[in-house]
Structures are given as structure tokens and as C-alpha cells.
């Protein structure tokens, strides 16, 4: 029973990811005919909101689903820098949010996060990193499944 309870949160995220017919489906802008970052603006402010709620998480300028800093904006701290590099990687791979290399690099970067956070941060960096890790681990798993299917394997 404990095994299934541990899997429940990941299974719900995995189910959501599997319902997406293409890896680009995570980009809501594709469904709406526009890119959220272009229409809603990009972040120039270090934020710390919804720290443990993955779909709503806003951390620094770059961490969060469909949330990113403006071009040229410096990250707020080490965790935010990991998210900035991940955002750039995803951008250079056709907005493929399930790109295994980008996601595994983010996980490695999160493992190395240390140092001070930004002034006014209301999030516990370790908890926030754990939330991001859970989402990205699920994306790695889904990416491996969906990309095998896309490759005809």
C-alpha cells in the first residue's frame, strides 16, 4: 500500500503528460496560437510564490512551468540559474519540454545548488528544489516513453 501511495503524485503527473499527444503540448501557447512569454511578458523580478505547488510555482525569474526571465536578465540565485539554463536548453530544442538531455542536466544542476538565496525569498530553497525535481523526474520518464514512440521504437 505504501508503494502505491508514494507513486500516486507521480502517476497523476504522468497521466497528464501521457494525455499530451506531442511533447510540445506542454506549451499552452501552441494550443492558444500564441506564446505565453510573448503575450504575458517575461519576469524581471525575483519572485517566490506557491513554492510547493508545482503547477503554480514561481521562483526567482526562471523557475516555474511556462514562466521565464526576460532575455539578458540575471538569475536570482543558484537554483534560478539552473532553471535559466534549462529554459535556454528547451528553447534551443524546439520547445521540447520533455527533452531528456535538458531535463537530466537540470536535475544534475539542482544537485549542486548551494549558497545564498535572493533578498525577500519566502520559499525554502530545498523544498522548492524538491518540487522541481519531482516534476522534472516525471518529465524525464515521460520523455523517454514518448520519444521512443515518436522514433517508432
Curated annotation (Swiss-Prot):
Please provide, in alphabetical order, the Gene Ontology terms of the cellular component aspect for this entry: extracellular region
* Gene3D superfamilies named in the record: Phospholipase A2 domain
Q: What is its EC number?
A: 3.1.1.4
Cystine pairs: 42-70, 46-76, 51-123, 63-83, 82-109, 89-102
Query: What superkingdom heads the lineage?
Result: Eukaryota
Gene Ontology MF terms: calcium ion binding; lipid binding; phospholipase A2 activity
Per the entry, the cofactor note is: Binds 1 Ca(2+) ion per subunit.
UniProt-annotated binding residues for Ca(2+): 62, 64, 67, 87
Residues of the signal peptide: 1-25
Q: Which InterPro entries match?
A: PLipase_A2_dom_sf, PLipase_A2_His_AS
Reactions catalysed according to its record: a 1,2-diacyl-sn-glycero-3-phosphocholine + H2O = a 1-acyl-sn-glycero-3-phosphocholine + a fatty acid + H(+)
Task: Offer one example of a GO biological process linked to this entry.
Answer: phospholipid metabolic process
Where mainly located? secreted
Q: Which UniProt keywords apply?
A: Calcium, Disulfide bond, Hydrolase, Lipid degradation, Lipid metabolism, Metal-binding, Secreted, Signal
Active-site residues are 86
Question: What subcellular locations does the record give?
Answer: Secreted
Cofactor(s) required, per the database record: Ca(2+)
- State the similarity comment: Belongs to the phospholipase A2 family.
Q: What does this protein do?
A: PA2 catalyzes the calcium-dependent hydrolysis of the 2-acyl groups in 3-sn-phosphoglycerides. Releases lysophospholipids (LPLs) and free fatty acids (FFAs) from membrane phospholipids in response to hormones and other external stimuli.
Put simply, this protein is called: Probable phospholipase A2 homolog 2
**What's the source species for this entry?**
Oryza sativa subsp. japonica
Question: Which gene is this protein's source?
Answer: PLA2-II
Amino acid at each position: 500500500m505504501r508503494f502505491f501511495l508514494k507513486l500516486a503524485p507521480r502517476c497523476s503527473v504522468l497521466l497528464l503528460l501521457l494525455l499530451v499527444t506531442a511533447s510540445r503540448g506542454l506549451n499552452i501557447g501552441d494550443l492558444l496560437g500564441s506564446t505565453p512569454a510573448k503575450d504575458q511578458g517575461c519576469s524581471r523580478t525575483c519572485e517566490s510564490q506557491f513554492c510547493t505547488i508545482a503547477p503554480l510555482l514561481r521562483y526567482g525569474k526562471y523557475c516555474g512551468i511556462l514562466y521565464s526571465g526576460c532575455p539578458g536578465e540575471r538569475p536570482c540565485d543558484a537554483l534560478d540559474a539552473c532553471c535559466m539554463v534549462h529554459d535556454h536548453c528547451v528553447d534551443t530544442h524546439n520547445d521540447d519540454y520533455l527533452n531528456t538531455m535538458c531535463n537530466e542536466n537540470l536535475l544534475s544542476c539542482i544537485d549542486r545548488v548551494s549558497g545564498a538565496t535572493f533578498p525577500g525569498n519566502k520559499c525554502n530553497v530545498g523544498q522548492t528544489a524538491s518540487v522541481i525535481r519531482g516534476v522534472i523526474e516525471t518529465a524525464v520518464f515521460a520523455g523517454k516513453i514518448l520519444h521512443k514512440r515518436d522514433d517508432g521504437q
